[in-house]
C-alpha cells in the first residue's frame, strides 16, 4: 500500500528530476541579465523556430538548402517538349492557370491536377500553350471562396505601369544569356563587402538598372579594392519605398531594375573582375 506521503515524495522527485534536466536560464539570458523578464517569451519563440525548422525539413529528412531549392521543382519550367507548372496548395479544391494565352479565362486545358496523396498540383502544357513574355496567374478555389494568386515559386514577376498590379511572366528568351566566366571562386582573405542597392545607386533621379550599375558603379567598386558586393532589395517586392523588405516573390529578381539576362550580365562582369555577389 502506497501512502499519501510516499506519493508526494515520488511526485517531488519527478519534478526535481525534470527541473534538473532543464537549463536554469537560456543562453541569451545568461549572457544578458536584462533579458530575464522576457525569458519565457524568448524561449517560446525559440521553440517555435525549432518546430518550424522541423516542419520545413520534414524532421531532418531534408535540409534547409533542399527546401530553399524548391524552385527547381515548383513553378513554371520549360521542358524539352512543352512546359510543366507545379504549385503547393494543400487546401485548394481547384487550380486554373489563367493568362494572356487563354484570355484570362478558366479552361479545362489549363486546369491543374492534384498529385494524389500530396498538397502538390501539376499542369503539363504543350509547346505552343504559352510563349515568352506572356503574363499569368493562378485562380485558386478553396472551401468557402476563391481568388487570383501569383504562384509562390514564380521566377519572373512584373508590374503593370497603369494599374500597379503584379503578374507572373513567362520567361524563355530566344537567346538565353551565355556566361563568359564559367568558374569563379571568391577571394575571402579577407572578404571586403560593398553593400549596394541597384535602384538607388545612380546619380539620376530615377530607379537605376542592372546595366547602369554594371557600367557606372561596378568599376568604382573594383577600383576601391572590394572583392564582394551584397545587393539589397533584389527579390521582388510590391512597394519600392520598403527598400526591399516587403518581399512578395522570393525567387524572382526584381523586374524594376531590368531583365534576368541583364542581372546575369552584371554578375558575370563582377565575377570576371574577381568580385563575389551576394
Predicted regions and their residues:
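Aromatic-lined carbohydrate-binding/catalytic grooves of carbohydrate-active enzymes
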Residues: 204, 208, 219-265
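Domain-wide signal for the mature, well-folded portions of proteins, strongly enriched
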Residues: 122-124, 199-202, 235-237, 266, ...
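Conserved, mostly hydrophobic/aromatic
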Residues: 87, 138, 196, 221, ...
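Short proline/glycine-enriched turn/loop motifs at strand-loop junctions of beta-rich domains
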Residues: 88-95
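The feature marks proteins involved in alpha-glucan
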Residues: 2-84, 105-195, 200-205, 212
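Short, well-ordered coil/turn segments that N-cap beta-strands
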Residues: 225-227, 271-275
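Conserved aromatic beta-strand anchor motif in extracellular beta-sandwich/beta-rich domains
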Residues: 97-99
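Hydrophobic faces of well-ordered beta-strands that scaffold small-molecule active sites
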Residues: 192-196, 229, 277-278
Amino acid at each position: 500500500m502506497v501512502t499519501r506521503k510516499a506519493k508526494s515524495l515520488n511526485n517531488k522527485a519527478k519534478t526535481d528530476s525534470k527541473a534538473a534536466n532543464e537549463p536554469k536560464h537560456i543562453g541569451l539570458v545568461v549572457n544578458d541579465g536584462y533579458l530575464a523578464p522576457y525569458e519565457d517569451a524568448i524561449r517560446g519563440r525559440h521553440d517555435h523556430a525549432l518546430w518550424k525548422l522541423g516542419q520545413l525539413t520534414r524532421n531532418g529528412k531534408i535540409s534547409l538548402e533542399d527546401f530553399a531549392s524548391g524552385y527547381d521543382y515548383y513553378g513554371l519550367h520549360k521542358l524539352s517538349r512543352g512546359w510543366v507548372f507545379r504549385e503547393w496548395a494543400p487546401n485548394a479544391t481547384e487550380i486554373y492557370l489563367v493568362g494572356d494565352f487563354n484570355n484570362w479565362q478558366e479552361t479545362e486545358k489549363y486546369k491543374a491536377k492534384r498529385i494524389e496523396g500530396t498538397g502538390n498540383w501539376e499542369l503539363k502544357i504543350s509547346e505552343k500553350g504559352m510563349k515568352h513574355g506572356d503574363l499569368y496567374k493562378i485562380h485558386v478555389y478553396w472551401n468557402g471562396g476563391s481568388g487570383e494568386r501569383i504562384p509562390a515559386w514564380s521566377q519572373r514577376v512584373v508590374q503593370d505601369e497603369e494599374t500597379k498590379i503584379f503578374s507572373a511572366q513567362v520567361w524563355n528568351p530566344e537567346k538565353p544569356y551565355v556566361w563568359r566566366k564559367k568558374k569563379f571562386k571568391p577571394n575571402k582573405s579577407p572578404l571586403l563587402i560593398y553593400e549596394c542597392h541597384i535602384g538607388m545607386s545612380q546619380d539620376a533621379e530615377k530607379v537605376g538598372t542592372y546595366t547602369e550599375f554594371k557600367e557606372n558603379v561596378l568599376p568604382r567598386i573594383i577600383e576601391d579594392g572590394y572583392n564582394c558586393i551584397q545587393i539589397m532589395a533584389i527579390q521582388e517586392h510590391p512597394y519600392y519605398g520598403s527598400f526591399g523588405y516587403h518581399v512578395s516573390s522570393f525567387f524572382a529578381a526584381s523586374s524594376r531594375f531590368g531583365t534576368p539576362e541583364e542581372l546575369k550580365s552584371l554578375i558575370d562582369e563582377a565575377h570576371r573582375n574577381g568580385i563575389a555577389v551576394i
